[in-house]
Amino acid sequence: LARREREPERIGFADIAGLEDLKRTVRLQIIEPFLKPGLFAKFRKRAGGGVLLYGPPGCGKTMIARAVATECRAEFMTVGISDVLNMYIGESERNLAAIFDKARHARPCVLFFDEIDALAYSRSKAQSEHTRQVVNEFLAQLDGFGTDNQEVLILAATNMPWDVDPAMKRPGRFSRQVFVPPPDEAARAHIVELKLRGVPHEGVDGREIAARTRHFSGADIEGVVELAKDYVLEDHLTREVERPIGQADLLRAAEATEATTLDWLRTARNLVKYAGADDSYKDVEAYLRQHKLV
């Protein structure tokens, strides 16, 4: 079922370059309430509950969740689709109940559900009764139906927040939703440096690569570095020219790569512009306006 994070894999906000606005939001809305429940209790605000991280694929939602657990000094437990869904009637619901029970026994704990849209798909769109039953059980667990979720911070990630059942976003469930945008320029430069660590390279300016990769996800940046490696290896194998990765290789790779976030951003733009989306997506709208995508 839920998998506990091994200590060597734990990272904190100090390990994440850039994204200062996002880190500030996460600290104020998620981490501080968890670390200082007494202060928030004075205002009838309690730690725990659920937070939905959403945004384009490959932009570090899982990394942010891991960092939150580290900053909260809490156990990190991650749950994937295969940990829950089962073909036999009732087994998926039992798996969910067991996962929440395990988290309560590990408190303080951050319980992270990846690809939540697959586990909590909108019941109005679902054609399967099994899907609806899983969502019902998920809602019951979030409500702490007959149990206690205090000191259990529930995080979830999705690339498709519009497919998540609306009931999941009501108060006390995943009522807090945090937009995780594509990495900013500082973060992109850091990713380039990180992916080149231990790899022969020379004269690389990560800042220039970052400037040429607007809207690229972290996964896109990794793809650029991998493509640059291919260029160098091709020279090794076909021309017997041994050399490190250079700036020209990375710029060529960046030019040959398209940002995979653009399709997501177009979908989000249409949702904000034409579908009459509520304030849930105001952060997305602000991002689109800031980057002149609307």
Locate each region found by the language model.
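Walker A/P-loop NTP-binding motif of AAA+ ATPase domains
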Residues: 6-212, 216
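Juxtamembrane/transmembrane-helix interface segments of polytopic membrane transporters
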Residues: 230-231
